[in-house]
Regions:
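Charged active-site motifs of nucleotide-sugar-dependent glycosyltransferases
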Residues: 39-44, 211-216, 226-228, 242-244
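A transmembrane-helix-recognition feature enriched in membrane-embedded lipid enzymes
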Residues: 1-28
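Conserved sugar-transfer catalytic core signal across GT-A, GT-B, and GT-C glycosyltransferases
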Residues: 126, 225, 290, 313-314, ...
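Active-site and donor-binding regions of nucleotide-sugar-utilizing enzymes
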Residues: 19-32, 36-202, 221-223, 236-241, ...
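Acidic donor-binding loop of glycosyltransferase active sites
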Residues: 110-114, 279-310
Length: 401
């Protein structure tokens, strides 16, 4: 614990210094748990990113319906995550730094009675300081992280001994949690939160003119992947003239660079952020929070991060929308679902612009069948209501009065 305290103190100093230099004083107050709190006892729910929070939404909504007596407070590591939670009508704050005195202030101010963390967000001061049960949903523990934990000696076992319920997102993670010290009676069902994704029933007038059978999406792309996507689009379009590309970069701030790249290849670009109609060669989806719209508009989806050494992004959301899936070789973040998809012929692996173009053309006549197969294959084995029933039972048993 001494080593962890030293490292977190150094990290906190860096974070606080950046906030002060950037004059982000509102963020600074939030990171120190100095902001206003709402009255009453709370269940503290933490999700690191927008993606984790969005994946948790079915669980959150089911929890709000099943347990109206439980007031929620949500924390995230980004202001966009906070804004997303607030748009759902939830009190949300930037996550407090994991320093003992800061965590104690947050727990006291919000009168926290239990803590529910998403995925790998296992912070020692939160886990050890929470007065009630600590639950983990969608826990992920890679082999690399499990090895790193050993650097902290007995801290990992102290933390895991305080976990009252943990639902791992895959069997490998569960085995590693148990080997690291998770009590056997705390092991919940194996469920990937992202599998709970239920596509919203959305309509967008701007996209309604696109023919889904002749539209493909390069989703959550990273630098280098746009080059591949644009080159593949040019090659495939020569044989499928109606083909349209929606290009949705992981970081919309890179939009100007992507426009220049496309123009250099002789492609015209329409930008979503400027309200332009998707009648150009490429429709640049340079906005945040609208990926569900783009999944619904495309019959074929290339999943970004799989060619850029990023481990790949989620296959669950495009699969739930019934899209035929294409991915590169780096799928380590979702190794198990991609293996199932590939084995069933519900996804196609590529490694270059040439193989991406070939996949786009080969998948066109069977994209609907592939999309239906992907949707069926990744359908969750347990719904959000069943998970909430398990969580609620633990809260009823363990939460102090």
């Amino acid at each position: 614990m001494l080593l962890y305290r030293l490292l977190t103190t150094l990290f906190a100093a860096v974070v606080l210094g950046r906030l002060v230099l950037g004059r982000s004083f509102g963020d600074l107050r939030a990171r120190l748990a100095l902001g206003p709190a709402e009255p009453g006892h709370h269940l503290w729910l933490h999700a690191a990113s927008n993606g984790e929070l969005a994946s948790a939404r079915p669980l959150i909504e089911a929890l709000r319906i099943a347990r109206p007596d439980l007031a929620l407070v949500v924390t995230c590591n980004s202001v966009t995550g906070v804004a997303l939670a607030q748009s759902w009508g939830l009190p949300a704050r930037l996550a407090p730094l994991d320093l003992g005195w800061v965590t104690r202030r947050f727990l006291r101010n919000w009168s926290v009675r239990a803590h529910l963390a998403m995925e790998s967000e296992l912070w020692p001061h939160r886990v050890l300081g929470c007065p009630g049960p600590v639950l983990i949903m969608g826990g992920r523990l890679s082999e690399r992280t499990a090895r790193a934990w050993r650097l902290f000696g007995g801290l990992q076992r102290r933390l895991l001994a305080r976990i009252h319920w943990l639902s791992a997102q895959d069997e490998g993670s569960l085995a590693r949690y148990l080997a690291a010290g998770l009590p056997a009676d705390a092991a919940g069902p194996v469920v990937d939160l992202k599998a709970l994704y239920d596509p919203p029933d959305l309509h967008d007038a701007t996209l309604s003119g696109l023919n889904r059978d002749h539209t493909w999406l390069a989703a959550s792309t990273h630098e280098g992947e746009e080059e591949t996507a644009l080159t593949a689009h040019l090659v495939a379009r020569a044989q499928e003239p109606e083909l349209r590309l929606i290009l949705a970069p992981r970081h919309p701030r890179r939009a100007d660079d992507i426009v220049r790249l496309a123009n250099a290849k002789g492609l015209t670009v329409a930008r979503r952020s400027l309200g332009e109609a998707p009648d150009a060669d490429v429709y640049l989806a340079d906005t945040l929070g609208e990926m569900a719209l783009f999944y619904a508009a495309a019959g074929r989806v290339f999943i970004g991060g799989t060619l850029a050494d990023r481990g790949g992004h989620t296959p669950y959301e495009p699969a739930a929308c019934g899209a035929a899936l294409i991915h590169g070789p780096d799928v380590r973040n979702f190794r198990a679902p991609f293996a199932r998809l590939d084995a069933a012929g519900a996804a196609c692996a590529i490694d270059s612009a040439e193989t991406l173009a070939a996949a786009l053309l080969a998948l066109h006549p069977r994209q609907r069948a592939m999309g239906q197969a992907a949707r069926a294959l990744l359908r969750p084995r347990m719904d959000a209501q069943a998970l909430v029933a398990g969580i609620s039972a633990r809260l009823d048993t363990l939460t102090p009065a």
